[in-house]
Amino acid sequence: MMGGVGLASVAAPYRRDPAMLDEPELKDHYRESVGTVRVEKTSYLKSSDELPDFANLKEARFSAQSCRRCPLWERATQTVFGSGDGKARLVFVGEQPGDAEDRTGLPFVGPAGRLLDRALNEAQINRDLCYVTNAVKHFKWEPLGQRRLHKKPTSREIQACRPWLQTEIELIQPEVVVGLGATAAASIFGGPVRIADVRGKLTHVESIGRTCLITAHPSSVLRAPDPDARQTEFDRLVQDLKLLQEFAG
């Protein structure tokens, strides 16, 4: 059995290398400084707007900050765009940012992200050579006291955000796109799919023109009812990820 994956082991602080946080190129807009507050002025992308062609990920990341293609931006702190190697052979797609991601602006830095790191290490895949993103770029939540609880995005919200994922894939040109969970799979395939039907198989997906692997989202491992079940689900996730070893270099 592989190393333990209890909740305590996943809760340690995760720190991303600051060198990976590229400052977006500021283009076709202007900014004002008011004391220490910088206000960016740019046009908003509404639901009816097609995305423009972007020269690179920095341009796409900056433009995504003004996305209004669905209402989720209204309650989110910020758009959480993808992060990582812009020439990665592997792109990992999750569901949406969580509370930690919404606050930091980076994908997969909360408990699910730390568990993903453990699984990638077990599968001998270097996360720093990968690109990680989400199918939906804003945190959807509902309040419970002082907490913000994750709420699953609707199919309309997934479809509204799908052009951003397609843009990331087109700019990176990865060899494999890895969908973590049902929402990611729906975005990749362009509609709902049963995870049981596609999990653990390298499959060509015509709509994005890429080989894809669908597996479980790390958060589903954390939700398993007891330590033994969590270990079983973690081991299964690692086994799926090992199918990617030939693309991990």
Stretches found by the model and what they are:
Residues 2-249:
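A polyanion-binding, active-site-adjacent surface
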